[in-house]
Design a protein with these regions (language model features):
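Active-site beta->alpha loop and helix N-cap motifs at the rims of alpha/beta catalytic domains
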Residues: 4, 9-14, 19-22, 27-105
Length: 105
């Protein structure tokens, strides 16, 4: 069995990255908001730090944010520029998310 850990908790990632058979990591804004409270870090700053811990080859899924398709596309491109390595963009399954996928071909 392969596992993907969905968290924004940097300390947890540091603890489990080498202890468990974690195949990939994932972070979305709703999970990250709780993990980032009080740290002073942004979603992207935290994602960069997690990427440093897990290495560039490990799949890392990050959700693009935005109220409109255009905002989601802009955020997706920003994530790809900032977070190197095997990074994949998650798009919310909603009308604006589907529109973003269609527009950004």
């Amino acid at each position: 069995m392969e596992y993907c850990l969905d968290t924004g908790d940097l300390e947890m990632v540091k603890k489990v990255a080498d202890l468990y058979p974690i195949r990939c990591f994932s972070m979305n804004p709703s999970i990250a908001v709780n993990c980032l409270r009080g740290t002073g870090r942004t979603f992207l700053q935290n994602a960069k730090m997690i990427r440093e811990v897990i290495g560039e080859d490990t799949p890392f899924y990050l959700e693009a944010m935005g109220d409109t398709a255009e905002e989601m596309i802009e955020d997706a491109h920003k994530i790809r520029q900032e977070i190197k390595g095997n990074t994949m963009i998650k798009i919310p399954a909603c009308p604006q998310g589907f529109k973003a996928i269609r527009l950004d071909r």
